[in-house]
Amino acid sequence: MLFRSILNRQNEARANWISGVSHDIRTPLSMIMGYAGRIAESKAASKSIREQAEIVRKQSVKIKELVQDLNLVSQLEYEMQPLHKEMVRLSKLLRSYVADLLNTGISDSYNIGIKITPDAENAVLECDARLISRAVNNLVQNSMKHNPQGCEVCLSLTASQNHLILAVTDNGMGLPAEKLQELEEKPHYMESTDERLDLRHGLGLLIVQQVAIAHNGTFKLTNVFPKGCEATLIFPYIG
């Protein structure tokens, strides 16, 4: 009991430290983004200066997203992220996500589809809808990012007596066999330099894993024949 108490305090201290650093970075970063944005749109600045300012602005946005992701991973891992659970019809959530994605005007190189089996159509899961959507978005964006030549991405939802299975499948280049083995051996580890697994700064996969765990679910990646990758979130469910 004493060891667990000490470990919990250490985990809480780590999470609070990351949260504090994230908060401290937010204000100066917002100022950098604001100034860079104004310069990028200034008619008084030369074309070269405007282009450089736009690069600074875009990279600042990436840093902001990285900080937010790092904070979210920490909060989820140490069970400090409040879960706003409600009864959510996942078929409706997925359709809404796909509609929003298509309305953003994605490239014609990507074909986004959705497949929901009759037994899952009215299935309701007690979950944090925002986090589930975030996990799905990370996986869809990863399929698109790592298949620049284009691919088909299918979101599917099926139900069994005990589980709801949410899958994101693409027909892209898939995962090297050695990387799949690494994931099985080290499910919470990912090299940020890995080109295929770098889901948004190397934290996206961890976010998906932690979202699954927070909902008493599991997450796995597999290759599909003849090519492509399938990411599966499995949640306990009583039909």
Give the residues covered by each predicted segment.
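Conserved phosphoacceptor histidine of two-component systems
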Residues: S19-H23
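Short alpha-helical segment of the dimerization/phosphotransfer core of two-component systems
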Residues: K58-I63
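Conserved micro-motifs of the catalytic ATP-binding
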Residues: Y78-L83, V124-C127
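Short helix-loop "hinge" at the ATP-lid/N-box region of the Bergerat-fold HATPase_c
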Residues: S143-M144
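Acidic ATP/Mg2+-coordinating residue in the GHKL
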Residues: D170
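Short conserved segment of the HATPase_c
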Residues: L175-E191
